[in-house]
């Protein structure tokens, strides 16, 4: 099976997000890479499901809460940008201050 660089990146995000979700389920607070991976993965999957860019921009701010992550992580993640594949092509989804 041949995967492009973008496909490998998406696969890596998915794997990190899955590990992070397992850690979160065990009650652990997420670190920076885990939080970004979960938000990014949710946006990628939402695009695949046919959701609109504007809806994903709003949804991206509801995925994680301040209490889900380690101290200082919300301030480190001012913005998450994801190049996602939608039904009508690839678009950039930007989520500002994703952790409230």
Swiss-Prot record:
Keyword Cell wall biogenesis/degradation found: no
Superkingdom of source: Bacteria
UniProt EC number: 3.5.1.5
One Gene Ontology MF term: nickel cation binding
One Pfam entry name: Urease_gamma
Complex and partners: Heterotrimer of UreA (gamma), UreB (beta) and UreC (alpha) subunits. Three heterotrimers associate to form the active enzyme.
Protein's recorded name: Urease subunit gamma
Organism expressing this protein natively: Clostridium perfringens
Organism ancestry: Bacteria, Bacillati, Bacillota, Clostridia, Eubacteriales
Encoding gene per record: ureA
């Amino acid at each position: 099976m041949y995967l492009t660089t973008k496909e490998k990146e998406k696969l890596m995000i998915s794997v990190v997000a899955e590990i992070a979700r397992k850690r979160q389920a065990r009650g652990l607070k997420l670190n920076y890479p885990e939080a970004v991976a979960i938000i990014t993965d949710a946006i990628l999957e939402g695009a695949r499901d046919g959701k609109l860019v504007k809806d994903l921009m709003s949804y991206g701010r509801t995925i994680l809460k301040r209490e889900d992550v380690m101290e200082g992580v919300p301030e480190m993640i001012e913005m998450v940008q994801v190049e996602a594949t939608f039904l009508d092509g690839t678009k950039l989804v930007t989520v500002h201050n994703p952790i409230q």
